[in-house]
Amino acid sequence: MAAAHNPDFVVITGGEPTVHDLNELTDELHKKGLKIHLETSGAFVIKGQFDWVTLSPKKWKMPLNENLESAEEIKIIVDSEDAIQRWADKIGSIVKAEHIWLHPEWSQRADPGIINSITEWVKAHGAPYRAGYQLHKMYQADSMDKRARPTVPLGGDEKLGY
């Protein structure tokens, strides 16, 4: 189905895709000549072959070191003024990603302290840190689509493991 639309790449995301063995799916997509991008918390072993991995860690289910080391991109959701420093302390020495995006947590996107902490961190540290924004939430595509599942609470659902 994806190949019929001739996309530049396919993104596997939603919930936590790595709770599944994705080898068969990625093999089939690669056979069709498609590049595959994975978005994950990094908390589980990645089973499948991906061309690009974006890791967005969650507080209560830390990412595996092997995933931190191999991810091309990291997305940190900044939910407090000290969040960036806390994540840097936890994972900074392991991460080898070329891009580390700092996104304000959606419900705090207008908080001057949060925005300033991102701005000052990027100014002080430069690459690989970049300021980002969760544009998909601004467009409300998920909340306006009757087929979409309810959103997950801030930071995930500890009872469900993500």
What do these predicted ranges mean?
Residues 1-12:
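Glycine/small-residue-rich loop that forms an oxyanion/phosphate-binding "nest" at active or ligand-binding sites
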Residues 14-16:
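Short, glycine/charge-rich beta-strand/loop segments that flank catalytic centers
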